[in-house]
Structures are given as structure tokens and as C-alpha cells.
A protein has these predicted regions:
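Rossmann-like adenosine-cofactor binding region
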Residues: 195-276
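Active-site cofactor/substrate anionic-group-binding motifs, chiefly glycine-
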Residues: 42-43, 47-95
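Short, structured coil segments at secondary-structure junctions
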Residues: 65, 95, 115-116, 172, ...
Length: 305
């Protein structure tokens, strides 16, 4: 495992290994054990798309592992504009021990990983969000005591979260149901890859336009914002189309009685989810947010340690 670009690229064993390491690092950190796995190492963090949770979790995680996080905004680095991605990768590999990148175009991450001889971590693209899903799987395990045989239902936009959740569920031995409106389905190539992963795992992938069908008996119920960065002009239209996909108390009743609710945040209460659900007793969103730190520490320790 040289990079973390997509969970589709990893084996089930590699995914489970990252989750086990994340849980171990979390437990030991809470017990006061310090880790210096990355002492003397520097992680360059490229952000062309801003994020509270991503920056804080990677900076704190790198520091807790004894390394140094170097923040690079779009003002500091012009990825693919002016200087080529090839030249950028070749310069950074001489000075850094790893690169984390959060950006719009997935191809930029693929190019960076191809050209740089140091590990590259995908911290989000418009296509995929693998680090978030590792945190989601970790959180599911903490609350359910297992992953194998559980069902996750995702209700909403067929976006990067839906894509990575399909990959993650397949690798973890979970069933997955995705409910999206017509014309807002998941990317066709990602779906084809995910179907291959589910065939190997022997688990079920359901793709539907019916949120009730998707959520039926689900152990984990997941949603995400209807309007991602760069889609602000479509806000009113999207809200109208997606309102039947709101995760509210009525829809949530169709899930398993002990289902947990997840959201990668930021959340917009009253739109993709109601306060009743997101602030209710079955919501685990802040455990999930915290686990970004621990899951990503496992990724950094594995790739850079």
C-alpha cells in the first residue's frame, strides 16, 4: 500500500488492518500513551478545497504521531496552474515524507500519486472521500461490535460520499443500499467497480430511487449535504428535488430499531436531516467526526511509518 486514493484499490485485509490500527491508536492515546511513529517526518497538506474537520484532524494527528504538518493553501501552491503537477510532485517529494490533498478534480490526485515517489493521501475529491469512510466504519464497529453482515443505507445525492461508502461497505463485508433521485445517481464507473467489489465479498448492493426501500432494516443510516461546494447556483432546485429524501423521524422508523445515524458534516438541519434525527439518541455524528483523527492517524502511520 503506497497511497490511499480509493478504498476500491485496497484489499479487505488492508481496510480491516487500518481500522484495527485506528482503534488501537485511539485507545492508547486515551490511556495517555504517546506515539512517535512519525518523528522527524513532514506531511504536506494541500488544500484547494477548505475544510474544518480535514485540516484539524490531519494537523492534530500528524502532531500526535510526532511529525510536522505543513499547511499549503491554494495561495501557496498552484496545482496544475502555472507549474505542472509533475514538477510540483517532483519538488515536494524531495522535501516531504508524504502529501495529503483535498481538492476538486480527482485526476489531480491520481497524477500526484503517479509522479511523486512519496505516499499520497486523498483527503477528498469530487469523486471520492476514503478517509471519511474509514472513520465511518470505525464508528460503526465501536457502536455495533462488528461490521460483517450489517446493512448501511445512504439517502441523498450520488456524490463522493455515496461512492466511497459503496467501496467501504464491500471491503468491510457489509450490505449497502443507496437511494438517490433520478438524474442524481452515482457515477457509472464507480458503480461498476463497486459491483465487482460486492461480487467478491458476497454482499448485496441495492441502487434505488426509493428511500423507504433503501432504509428498510438498515443498521446504519447515512446522509450528506444536498449542495456540495461548487453547486451553490443549483441550491434552490436541488432542495426541491431532494426534499422527499430528507432523513426524518418518519423515514428513520423503517430502519432497524437500534440503527445509528451518521453524517460526514457539515449538516444543514431541516434539509437533508431533521433536528429530531441528527440531535437524537441514535445519532453518532460527533463520534464519527472524532474518528477522522484516529482513522487518518492509522493511514499516516501505515504509509509513512
Amino acid at each position: 500500500m503506497k497511497d490511499l486514493i480509493s478504498l476500491h484499490d485496497l484489499t479487505s485485509e488492508e481496510v480491516k488492518g487500518l481500522l484495527e490500527l485506528g482503534l488501537k491508536l485511539k485507545k492508547e492515546h486515551k490511556s495517555g500513551i504517546e506515539h512517535h511513529i512519525l518523528k522527524g517526518k513532514t506531511l504536506g497538506m494541500i488544500f484547494t478545497k477548505s475544510s474544518t474537520r480535514t485540516r484539524v484532524s490531519f494537523e492534530v494527528g500528524m502532531t500526535q504521531l510526532g511529525g510536522y504538518p505543513l499547511f499549503l493553501s491554494s495561495n501557496d501552491i498552484q496545482l496544475g496552474r502555472g507549474e505542472s503537477i509533475y514538477d510540483t510532485a517532483k519538488v515536494l517529494e524531495r522535501m516531504l515524507d508524504g502529501i495529503m490533498i483535498r481538492t476538486y478534480a480527482h485526476q489531480d490526485v491520481l497524477d500526484l500519486a503517479e509522479y511523486a515517489n512519496i505516499p499520497v493521501i486523498n483527503a477528498l475529491t469530487d469523486l471520492l472521500h476514503p478517509c471519511q469512510v474509514l472513520a465511518d466504519l470505525m464508528t460503526t464497529y465501536e457502536h455495533k461490535g462488528k461490521l460483517e453482515g450489517l446493512k448501511l443505507a445512504y439517502i441523498g445525492d450520488g456524490n463522493n460520499m455515496a461512492h466511497s461508502l459503496m467501496y467501504g461497505c464491500a471491503k468491510a463485508g457489509m450490505d449497502c443500499a443507496i437511494a438517490t433521485p433520478e438524474n442524481y445517481q452515482c457515477d457509472a464507473e464507480v458503480v461498476a467497480n463497486a459491483k465487482d467489489d460486492f461480487k467478491k465479498s458476497g454482499k448485496e448492493l441495492i441502487l434505488t430511487t426509493d428511500p423507504v426501500e433503501a432504509i428498510k432494516n438498515a443498521d446504519v443510516v447515512y446522509t450528506d449535504t444536498w449542495v456540495s461546494m461548487g453547486q451553490e447556483a443549483e441550491k434552490a432546485e436541488r432542495q426541491k428535488i431532494f426534499m422527499p429524501y430528507q432523513v426524518n423521524g418518519e423515514l428513520f422508523k423503517n430502519a432497524a430499531d437500534d440503527a445509528v445515524f451518521m453524517h460526514c458534516l457539515p449538516a444543514y438541519r431541516g434539509f437533508e436531516v431533521t433536528e429530531e434525527v441528527i440531535d437524537g439518541p441514535q445519532s453518532v455524528i460527533f463520534d464519527e467526526a472524532e474518528n477522522r483523527l484516529h482513522a487518518q492517524k492509522a493511514v499516516m502511520a501505515t504509509l509513512m511509518g
